[in-house]
Amino acid sequence: LIVGIISPEFLSIATSLTQQFDFSELLINVMLPFLLFAGAISVNVHELLNDKWVILLLASFGVIFSTFAVGTAVFWITQQPLFGLSEMGLTYVDCLLFGALIAPTDPIAVLAMVKKMNLSSVTETRIAGESLFNDGIGVVVFLTLLSIKMEGIENITPQSVSLLFINEVVGGVILGAVMGFLGLKLVKYIENEHVELEVIITLSLVLLAPLISHQFHFSAVLAVVVMGLFLNQNIDSDKKAEGLQKAMGDYVYKFWHLLDETLNAILFILIGLEIIPILQNFALGYVFIIIMVIIIVVVSRGIGVFLPITLLSIKKQFEEKTALIITWGGLRGGLSVALALNLPDSIGEGKDLILILTYSVVLFTILVQGLTLKKIVKS
């Protein structure tokens, strides 16, 4: 990003490069399934199942609340004559789409960050699980709103929206469970020494799940996450065998860890390349609006986390500063960028504004929140 600003030649090369491929398509259909699967097989699945209702409530309420809180606030900002954005013609649904794409956190960045902090395993699992599932829920909410945008709100009924939402969520979970169960049974009959076969099987499953999901309009994100939980490194494939054996050999999990790190590095390079051309449409007048939106996003995230934790703390124990860690540790990344790029051109000039706001929030969460979280936790 900095090189692109300093060197106009690099800016030209980056612009040309990003126009040669569809970043949104590459991330959502190729990179994201691999990254989510890698995260799902490494999380502590036993503690995740014990805290499933806590994680699901945090993920679902947080995303839905943030979507409407951020979307409503941004719509109000665009309607104020003071900011001069009313001519862009952003509708309430357009602003809700921004709220939906910026609500889910980046599980890859969150998982990497959580592992570096000395948190209890329960808190670590809650944070990792919430981040994994809010991605799936966020994509479903975004696609539901996108369907309303494309078909026209007058042609949409509450029943059709509910059916679309249920089909995405339930279908994705069932598909992931079926493929995960079959995959577990398959690797169970393969000796863990045959690493190459287990790697090929897992790669095939991750490639196949999104293809089937898109065919039946299921959530590919949820399917891959659920499938990964079935092949988790903490799952015992056969408790009657000598000792407790993992579903797959250690080298398979090491392979996925390496792939996770590699794809994550590539992802952030691609995000940087995508940001550079967008900055050409940046105007100084956006600075105040960006600051306001960042504050709105962080506060909405905080409320969306604090309320469920307050309710759940009646029966569940939470480590001190859990709400603060989940709020400030809610880094945004490639998914938000990909969804923003996937917005229809019918939004008009407002799409450039949404892209700039999205990149600004992503950069703030990574550079400011990501680098200061440890200090905040220790304070």
Positions of predicted regions on the chain:
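Transmembrane helical cores of multi-pass secondary ion antiporters/exchangers
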Residues: 1-379
